[in-house]
């Protein structure tokens, strides 16, 4: 998330990336916005106050809208190669502003059989009830599901619920991580 770097630039006293993630995931303002309980203006005002950011709401929202940078160019091919053999679901801590970009700019929701954006579901990772909600909605047991995420906190939470979980820090590490589990995914230029 580009926003982590930006938040640390705005306010270096926020600490390390892990410390900022812990604060972000536990933030009342983030939780309210990314579970659909508040609007973007109230969110911006609350984040600025909570994190002591030296910017106004307009500046924050202008940058926040672009924190998701892009979709990796091989993501569609990799997910398509998996979708023919596995049921794919996205669990995303997100908000209406970012989800609109995911759909409009990258058609991301179409790459999954099921989507569980937090602002629509009303739940957030790393909370156990988010994982449990998704498992119930899909009708599968935790030990029959694999969860991958770039955030260690979310991976540990998924494991605590009983899911198989892997931390994958960047897209290029995804196919090798899946291959270690016997799941072979194709990307352009790779043999399947």
Where are these regions (language model features)?
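Short alpha-helical
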Residues: 2-6, 28, 70, 97, ...
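Active-site neighborhood of HAD-like aspartate-dependent phosphohydrolases
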Residues: 1-26, 50-54, 160
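A metal-dependent, Asp-based hydrolase signature
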Residues: 30-60
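Asp-based, Mg2+/Mn2+-dependent phosphohydrolase catalytic module
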Residues: 95-96, 100-192
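Alpha-helical elements of Rossmann-like donor-binding domains used by nucleotide-donor carbohydrate transfer enzymes
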Residues: 5-9, 28, 42, 46, ...
């Amino acid at each position: 998330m580009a926003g982590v770097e930006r938040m640390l630039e705005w306010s270096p006293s926020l600490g390390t990336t892990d410390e900022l993630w812990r604060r972000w995931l536990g933030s009342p303002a983030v939780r309210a916005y990314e579970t659909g309980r508040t609007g973007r203006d109230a969110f911006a005002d609350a984040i600025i106050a909570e994190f002591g950011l030296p910017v106004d709401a307009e500046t924050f929202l202008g940058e926040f809208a672009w924190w998701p940078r892009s979709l990796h160019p091989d993501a569609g091919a990799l997910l398509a190669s998996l979708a023919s053999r596995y049921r794919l679901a996205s669990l995303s801590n997100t908000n209406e502003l970012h989800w609109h970009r995911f759909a409009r700019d990258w058609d991301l929701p179409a790459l999954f059989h099921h989507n569980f954006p937090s602002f629509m579901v009303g739940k957030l990772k790393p909370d156990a009830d988010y994982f449990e909600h998704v498992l119930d909605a899909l009708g599968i047991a935790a030990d029959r599901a694999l969860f991958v995420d770039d955030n260690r906190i979310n991976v540990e939470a998924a494991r605590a619920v009983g899911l198989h979980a892997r931390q994958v820090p960047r897209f290029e590490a995804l196919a090798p991580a899946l291959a270690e589990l016997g799941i072979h995914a194709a990307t352009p230029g790779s043999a399947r």
